[in-house]
């Protein structure tokens, strides 16, 4: 079944909607999109799971809050990029970092002490999810 799904066939409905293979040209398009003047195009690059590290690092410093917010939402964003975003001036960006499942523990510690009550509440909420999982597994 796993091979059938990977080829876009089989009984799994998701198999019909698989993305095309990641190619050098797709990576080049993501790089180009990350440099576009339109922030909506850069947001799309920030949401990509396949962007190269240098793209993620550049987008973490993007002047547009929406671009940085999209990057903070990306579960594939590298830990160092999420650490950078955990210090962002935007409460919205920090809030999305707080609920990203890939954020490293040291960044979560920083966010736990954040000046924003919203960010602090999101950190507590995420911790409660982990506590609930521990109860289920016990």
What are these model-predicted stretches?
Residues 1-138:
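Alpha-helical scaffold segments
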